[in-house]
Structure formats: structure tokens, C-alpha cells
Regions:
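Enriched for short, Lys/Arg-rich terminal
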Residues: 2-4, 8-25, 58-64, 68-86
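A short, surface-exposed loop/turn module that caps and links secondary-structure elements
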Residues: 32-58
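PIN-domain endoribonuclease scaffold, especially VapC-family toxins
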Residues: 24-32
């Protein structure tokens, strides 16, 4: 499965590399779990965001991984910092 990053998500991911390695490890674990188990099953309490038409998993209490898989089976990372309601 190819991983494609929205520009803002990639910037957030790079920021985690210098800000918090523990969070970066958690994000990587969530991505691996999505690749293994799919959109709706696995760690991080997968949740469909009906208004955004995307999926969300908990990185921690304050941050969510927002993602989707397109028709070509590419995993799109939309955001990995903050909360979708922010």
C-alpha cells in the first residue's frame, strides 16, 4: 500500500520528528496497523468522520490521525496533529 501525504500532514509529521519521538512512534504504529487491518479495525479507536468523509484514529488525547484509502488502494494521510474539531 502506497502512503501519500497531504502537504499539511507531511509538515506535521516532520514537526513530530523534532518535537516528540514518542508521538512519532505512535503515528507510525497507527499507519502500520491501517496497512495490516484496514480502515475500520485496529488500534487507536478507528472512527468514521461522516462530515469529512474520512477516518480518524487517536494518537493521544489531543491529536488524531486523519486518513483515507482511495480507489487505487493508496493510504492518504490527511492530518496527524490536532483534533478534527479544532
Amino acid at each position: 500500500m502506497n502512503k501519500l501525504w497531504a502537504d499539511v500532514a507531511w509538515d506535521e509529521y516532520l514537526a513530530w520528528q523534532s518535537e516528540d519521538k514518542k508521538t512519532l512512534i505512535r503515528i507510525n504504529s497507527l499507519i502500520k496497523d491501517i496497512e495490516t487491518n484496514g480502515l475500520a479495525v485496529g488500534i487507536g479507536k478507528p472512527e468514521f468522520l461522516k462530515y469529512l468523509k474520512r477516518w480518524s484514529r487517536r494518537i493521544d488525547e489531543k491529536n488524531r490521525l486523519i486518513y483515507d484509502i482511495d480507489e487505487n488502494k493508496n493510504l492518504w494521510i490527511i492530518s496527524c496533529k490536532g483534533h478534527y474539531e479544532d
